[in-house]
Amino acid sequence: STHGKIRIHDYVANGYVILFSHPGDFTPVCTTELAAMANYAKEFEKRGVKLLGISCDDVQSHKEWTKDIEAYKPGSKVTYPIMADPDRSAIKQLNMVDPDEKDAEGQLPSRTLHIVGPDKKVKLSFLYPSCTGRNMDEVVRAVDSLLTAAKHKVATPANWKPGECVVIAPGVSDEEAKKLFPQGFETKDLPSKKGYLRFTKV
């Protein structure tokens, strides 16, 4: 990688990692994405989340390309490592292969982003086509959702943002919910009367 040899398992350690692939260095959408990732690095760092990029280009290419990324967004620094996977073995193992995009060497990485948890398991994946850049605000929101869910035995509803109500997980009984959420919770009165949609604040 651009930071020396990295073993993904060791890099994750006991924290969260955003592992993201890009189809190629010196390409337009990827340049804007990695610049955006650099701009958001402090947001992820505040949440205890590390970043790790990967593509099939070699380390020297990554290092040269980094100059373009930083020039495109003045003030942004690419402080996270970018891994080189020239034989494409890692992207295949990580299910980051684009079925349609190829070069002379074979299939290229897709625009995939995995959020990996402390247990080394993928908690969430985004898959974008090569023509569509990622939305970093949504990546931050997804990280906040995962961290909140892991800490409080809750789930987050559609369009949720930090500070808004969350829903209590279906596996938590009302009795257990009273202990877990002494601040109380609201059960929505729906036609089915099943009492499954319970909102609370955490």
UniProtKB/Swiss-Prot annotation:
Embryos. Thiol-specific peroxidase that catalyzes the reduction of hydrogen peroxide and organic hydroperoxides to water and alcohols, respectively. Seems to contribute to the inhibition of germination during stress. The lineage of its organism: Eukaryota, Viridiplantae, Streptophyta, Embryophyta, Tracheophyta. GO terms for molecular function: thioredoxin-dependent peroxiredoxin activity. The keyword Mitochondrion does not apply. This is Probable 1-Cys peroxiredoxin. Keywords: Antioxidant, Cytoplasm, Nucleus, Oxidoreductase, Peroxidase, Redox-active center. Its EC number is 1.11.1.24. GO terms for biological process: cell redox homeostasis. One of its GO terms (cellular component) is nucleus. The keyword Cytoplasm applies. PROSITE patterns: THIOREDOXIN_2. It is an enzyme of class 1 (oxidoreductase). It is found in: Nucleus; Cytoplasm. PANTHER family: MCG48959-RELATED, PEROXIREDOXIN-6. Residues 1-148 form the Thioredoxin domain. It comes from the Eukaryota. A motif (Bipartite nuclear localization signal) lies at residues 178-201.
